[in-house]
Amino acid sequence: MPDPTQNPNVTPELEQHAAPEAAAEAAPESSADVMPSLEETLRQAELKAAEHYDAWLRAKAEGENIRRRAQEDIAKATKFAAEKFASAMVPVKDSLEAALAVENQTVEKLREGVELTLKQLVSAFEGAGLAEENPLGQKFDPNKHQAISAIEAEGEPNTVINVLQKGYLLHERVVRPALVVVSKAKAQ
């Protein structure tokens, strides 16, 4: 026989949900214990959020400082990029001025002075990574050479047979293409 005190409409799930509510009503002092714990948890979360915000602000400022320093370094590098080359060119100018200052100069002495000055200039070019391009006898390369004319000649077509003006490369980049005359096949 069913228990007359038990409600037949109450399922075990409803009893489980009702149990915590009944326990909360039965023990009001335990809810007071729970509230300070929630307040303490909230306070700790707010402190942690403030710490994270402060760390984020510091990281953001550091990132901006790094970016600013990098821009300053780039500006300085751009401004003084030619400093090494310029300092290598000063002795060349000094040599030319000294040659012009001598009044009674023989042609041989003048030639010697010009040759020494040319050596200084070539050394300065090499120090700066500027290389001379003299393509005589090489296959024509439109990336490095500028053909002024093409003439019939013996040998393989598209070969440089005369260099009118040397070219220059700065670290493998063309600064000035060589002006050349290129061979073409003889007409049959």
Swiss-Prot record:
PANTHER family: GRPE PROTEIN (PTHR21237), GRPE PROTEIN HOMOLOG, MITOCHONDRIAL (PTHR21237:SF23). It is found in: Cytoplasm. It comes from the Bacteria. PROSITE patterns: GRPE. The gene is grpE. GO terms for cellular component: cytosol. Pfam families: GrpE. Residues 1-35 are annotated as: Disordered. This is Protein GrpE.
